Swiss-Prot record:
Encoding gene per record: Ifna1
Gene3D superfamilies from the UniProt entry: 1.20.1250.10
Transmembrane segments: none
Biological role stated in the UniProt entry: Produced by macrophages, IFN-alpha have antiviral activities. Interferon stimulates the production of two enzymes: a protein kinase and an oligoadenylate synthetase.
Taxonomic path: Eukaryota, Metazoa, Chordata, Craniata, Vertebrata
Further information: There appear to be at least 12 rat interferon-alpha-1 genes. The antiviral activity of this interferon appears to be independent of glycosylation.
Keyword Transferase: no
Name listed for the protein in its UniProt record: Interferon alpha-1
Native source species: Rattus norvegicus
Keyword Phosphoprotein: no
Length: 192
């Protein structure tokens, strides 16, 4: 029940993502793709999460770097881009293609690729807007290290079905945090 509630809450947050909160022109379809990404990820379940409890692992998600109060709008775009790129890399790997239903996986990756394209366009618009390079690089490095730990975990567990279920749950968490960041930035923009 708690997971269903979290899923529905994430969909609500994602549905209110606004391109204006990033200060760039993301198409309206970006919001729809975000909803679809969550829906597809939920549909990709192959095993009951209960059967994989013994395989759970703490990956050290850099919450303060992705959803912390100190992250600024200019920092958000590169961090969200990196997060999306890393998720796409995980799910386009050769090992991933054997773990999931091909149709769902293709749709999921296609929607992530479209989101990545929109974020890339935002990055290009942001050229010249400088955030502290050290702060931004610190956040990007934290995201990369987090996904490196996930990749190592998958390799150590020989890309087992339970390992992929654990990773899918972790990706859900990462996507939820990015949705929370977008919601917070939107609120900040509306308040100003």
């Amino acid at each position: 029940m708690a997971r269903l509630c979290a899923f529905l809450m994430s969909l609500v947050v994602v549905s209110y993502w606004s391109a204006c909160c990033l200060g760039c022109d993301l198409p309206h379809t970006h919001n729809l793709r975000n909803k679809r990404v969550f829906t597809l990820l939920a549909q990709m379940r192959r095993l009951s999460p209960v059967s994989c409890l013994k395989d759970r692992k703490y990956f050290g998600f850099p919450l303060e770097k992705v959803d912390g109060q100190q992250i600024q709008k200019a920092q958000a775009i590169p961090v969200l881009h990196e997060l999306t790129q890393q998720i796409l890399s995980l799910f386009t790997s050769k090992e991933s293609s054997t773990a999931w239903d091909a149709t769902l996986l293709d749709s999921f990756c296609n929607d992530l690729q479209q989101q990545l394209s929109g974020l890339q366009a935002c990055l290009m618009q942001q050229v010249g807007v400088q955030e502290s390079p050290l702060t931004q690089e610190d956040s990007l490095l934290a995201v990369r290290e987090y996904f490196h730990r996930i990749t190592v975990y998958l390799r150590e567990n020989k890309h087992s079905p339970c390992a992929w279920e654990v990773v899918k749950a972790e990706v859900w968490r990462a996507l939820s945090s990015s949705a929370n960041l977008m919601g917070r930035l939107r609120e900040e923009r509306n308040e100003s």
